[in-house]
Amino acid sequence: MFLSASTAGLAILGAQYWGKRDIKTLDDIFSMAIRICGIVSVLFFVACAFFPKYLMLIFTNEPVLIDYGVSYLRIAAFSYLLTGFSQCYIVMMKISEHAGSAAAVSSITVVLNILLNAIFIYGAFGIRSMNVRGAALATLIARIVELLLAVIFSYRPGFIRLKVHELFVRNKQLSKDFMKCSGPILGASLVWGIGFTSYSSFMGHLGTDAAAANSVAAVVRDIICCLSAGISSAAGIMVGNELGAGNLKRGKTYGIRLLKLSVVCGVIMTILMAVSAPVILYFVKLTPQAGVYLKQMFVVLALYI
């Protein structure tokens, strides 16, 4: 939530300055976002690395699930140190008209994560099965590769790259503008985040069947909602670029068209969510009771989408 709000502020404000072709200010915004994301990343790393059991108790009281969660978080915590930095780089690629490179980095990371999950969780190529710890290790390696690729891409001509000396320079006016963009998004994200965290916590305390069904439903929801996230990200950048360039009329036109497109996509995603339960149940192993929970969750999530 905190990282999403910070990178959203970077996208909104940065897109406008890219429209103006004000690279100096864009460098300052990039450094500011890196500082904020770095602080947030360290805080979450400390919480997950040193207090994983207390975090898991928020979501479940099942000893088995807590043990799995603790094993996962102690390794995955290191990936949280990198996530904020890599996401800032990827957002900078998007707003500076290098969305293809950003997509390439993200796609490589996702494919690598899937392959490593299969290898580490189940065991392959001489590597023993690591179960939950394998999933965490796969995530960590994928995040390392993602950040390395993002940094390497940033040194190509026409890309915005981090200037280390600017990390320690604070622009008060720019900080205020950044918080004006990020603050409302953070507030909205916190409200939604608290809601979904509470929801997950309730599911976890209902037992393993409910927790398993909720885990599957959350993954499917996130996959289907990727389209919505992509449209909203593109809308903010496209409109921001035009506003920064002074093309107010074109920016308004883009905004209206993308708003209409989002409504159509919302309907499509709702239908997909509503009809996908039988297909998902065919591919995952759940108890009969967990299957019932999953179908009910899909109905609720379809209405939410």
Where are these regions (language model features)?
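Short runs within selected transmembrane alpha-helices of multi-pass transporters and secretion channels
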Residues: 4-7, 11, 76-95, 102-113, ...
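Helix-terminus/linker motif at the lipid-water interface of multi-pass membrane proteins
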Residues: 56-63, 119-130, 190-223, 241-242, ...
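Alpha-helical transmembrane segments of multi-pass membrane proteins
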Residues: 63-89, 220, 288-305
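Membrane-interface helix-loop junctions in multi-pass transport and translocation proteins
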Residues: 111-148, 277, 292
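Short membrane-interface helical motifs at transmembrane helix boundaries
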Residues: 43-74, 268-295
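Small-residue-rich hydrophobic transmembrane alpha-helices
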Residues: 1-45, 83-102, 200, 213-277
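Residue-level signature of transmembrane alpha-helical cores of multipass secondary-active transporters
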Residues: 37, 76, 102, 106, ...
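Interhelical loop/hinge segments that connect adjacent transmembrane helices in multipass membrane
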Residues: 132, 136-139, 148-192
